[in-house]
Amino acid sequence: MHGDTINIQDVILDLVPQPEIDLQCYEQLDYEQFDSSEEDETDNVRNQQARQAEQEACYRIEAECCVCNSIVQLAVLSSRQNVRAVEQLLMGDVSLVCHQCATY
């Protein structure tokens, strides 16, 4: 609006949505090995990438009930190595029981 009086021409009727700005910082720093040398920085980047690869993820495990042979599903949050260990256990001596068979 310009001036002391309101004019219809001064009123803006078209609203333009503002784009959302992501203010999240996705940077992760390793403070224990923080050093200004370039070699240490490249090592830190490699270590950080290795840590991110080993971070926990959500996995769904399906196995048969040892009593009624129905499918039992587990959702686990674990590293890839630990999921492999669970897989080896389920292929060996460990068996899962479904909810219905467990209540008898």
UniProtKB/Swiss-Prot annotation:
Region (E7 terminal domain): 1-47
Top-level taxon of the source organism: Viruses
Predominant cellular place of this UniProt entry's protein: host cell
Keywords: Activator, DNA-binding, Early protein, G1/S host cell cycle checkpoint dysregulation by virus, Host cytoplasm, Host nucleus, Host-virus interaction, Inhibition of host innate immune response by virus, Inhibition of host interferon signaling pathway by virus, Interferon antiviral system evasion, Metal-binding, Modulation of host cell cycle by virus, Oncogene, Transcription, Transcription regulation, Viral immunoevasion, Zinc, Zinc-finger
InterPro entries according to UniProt: Papilloma_E7
KW S-adenosyl-L-methionine (keyword) present: no
Annotated motif Nuclear export signal, positions: 83-91
Intervals of motif LXCXE motif: 23-27
A cellular-component GO term for this protein: host cell cytoplasm
Classification via Pfam families: E7
Oligomer status and interactors: Homodimer. Homooligomer. Interacts with host RB1; this interaction induces dissociation of RB1-E2F1 complex thereby disrupting RB1 activity. Interacts with host EP300; this interaction represses EP300 transcriptional activity. Interacts with protein E2; this interaction inhibits E7 oncogenic activity. Interacts with host TMEM173/STING; this interaction impairs the ability of TMEM173/STING to sense cytosolic DNA and promote the production of type I interferon (IFN-alpha and IFN-beta).
Sequence similarity: Belongs to the papillomaviridae E7 protein family.
Record text about domains: The E7 terminal domain is an intrinsically disordered domain, whose flexibility and conformational transitions confer target adaptability to the oncoprotein. It allows adaptation to a variety of protein targets and exposes the PEST degradation sequence that regulates its turnover in the cell.
Biological function: Plays a role in viral genome replication by driving entry of quiescent cells into the cell cycle. Stimulation of progression from G1 to S phase allows the virus to efficiently use the cellular DNA replicating machinery to achieve viral genome replication. E7 protein has both transforming and trans-activating activities. Induces the disassembly of the E2F1 transcription factor from RB1, with subsequent transcriptional activation of E2F1-regulated S-phase genes. Interferes with host histone deacetylation mediated by HDAC1 and HDAC2, leading to transcription activation.
Protein name: Protein E7
Species of the source: Human papillomavirus 69
Lineage per the UniProt record: Viruses, Monodnaviria, Shotokuvirae, Cossaviricota, Papovaviricetes
Protein's gene: E7
